[in-house]
Amino acid sequence: MRRALALGLGCWLGCWGCGAEPSPAVELLHRADDGAAQLEDQLLIPYRARHPGLRVVQRNAALSQPEYRRLLLTATARDTLPDVFQLDDVDVPALADRGGALDLVPYLSRAGVDLARYNQEVLAIFRRGAALYGLPRGYAPLMVAYNRDLLDRAAIPYPTDDWTWDEFQRMAQLLTRDRDGDGRIDQWGAAFDRRPSVWVAWIWAGGGDVLCPGGRRASGCLDAAATVAAIRWYGGWVTRWAIAPRPHDPTASGVEIARLFTAGRIAFMTVGHDAVRALRSQVAAGGLRVGFAPIPHRAGVPPATLLYATGYAVPAGGLRRKAGVELAADLTDSLPDAARGGAGIELPAVAAAAQEVAAADTTGWEAAFLRAAGHGRSGWGARVGQWREVEAELASLMDRVTVGGADPARAVRATARELDRLLGATR
């Protein structure tokens, strides 16, 4: 189904703008499932009312982030990007640094955009020097979701905003059990996720990092003592303490983790804001009680987490730049942002709207995400053009440590050398 959808969208992008006369419609492309697309269509109503003679065509792509990225890069190469398109943080280097996205700064005053309204940490993701290549729409930090019922049964207090690795490990060990007495563990304290997009946040919270400042080399940072210790500790969830089930199919790790969590077989899992909508439905059905806490940090190390962001951008070679910028500005204002936040899609990038969403949320989830975001920073994917290749090497590193039994110190030294070569630090 996804392949057919991608092919269909690819054909649309390939044909868009290829006629003798430009289409009178303003085209919008974003990555969303049907529910989010329906909301986005409602958010277009005020814009359409103010521009009665202008038709707006919305296309949503229910694709994974890598699939959506390929779609954008193909459209960029063919010069067929639509008038406004969703720009994820990890696509900023490819679309902005290579000239695919328009610098919006010269158009902002005419569109009535006040950049002070946005969360400045999130806004910086779309900046390159004085240029701005996207208006931020929403963002989210990585968090830990926990099953309140499992903690209550074990008489374990819920984690605080300042909990540490030691507290996390103690709780996870207490929550790892053989519930049916058959000699095999069937309830785990934590979920081990092999994806670097998830575990890098844990390395940061341990005082380490996978790349050095500037993102041009790994040696001196990936192989630093703090990073090695953090990788050893994170991998130890499965290799030493057995507080997490061993990963099997890496391509389905997120789906399997979510299934085990909702079945009450995992107490803690690392999630982004995309988990909120699914968990809301589970909680509403009465089968699950959930809380959220920040990524725990190593004692003596400041809290840290990853921020992921989305925005709307306009193609540099677009024929309707003015209309595109106006539409992007409209869709990233406080009211649309608050609507997405209220629907559980993401935290609003407009700071005031984020506060309003958190205050209105009776579960306390949004407030927890907002507090954790105060310790967040953008991931390397928003800054390093070769991140996909770097990410693949890091995933292989974690597999060698957890599945292959490699010594973390030796494994990271080899990976650091390979990343230096990949990033051009060595020849």
Language model segments and positions:
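Conserved N-terminal structural module of periplasmic/extracytoplasmic solute-binding proteins
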Residues: 4, 15-94, 111-116, 250, ...
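Hinge/lid segment of periplasmic solute-binding proteins
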Residues: 89-141, 293
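Short, solvent-exposed loop/beta-turn-alpha elements that line the ligand-binding surface or hinge
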Residues: 105-118, 161, 180-190, 208-230, ...
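Extracytoplasmic/periplasmic solute-binding protein
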Residues: 129-137, 142, 167-220, 226, ...
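Conserved C-terminal helix/tail region of periplasmic/extracytoplasmic solute-binding proteins
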Residues: 152, 355, 371-427
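Glycine-centered hinge/linker elements that transmit conformational signals in sensory
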Residues: 171-172, 216-249, 295
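C-terminal lobe and pocket-closing loops
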Residues: 275-285, 298-396
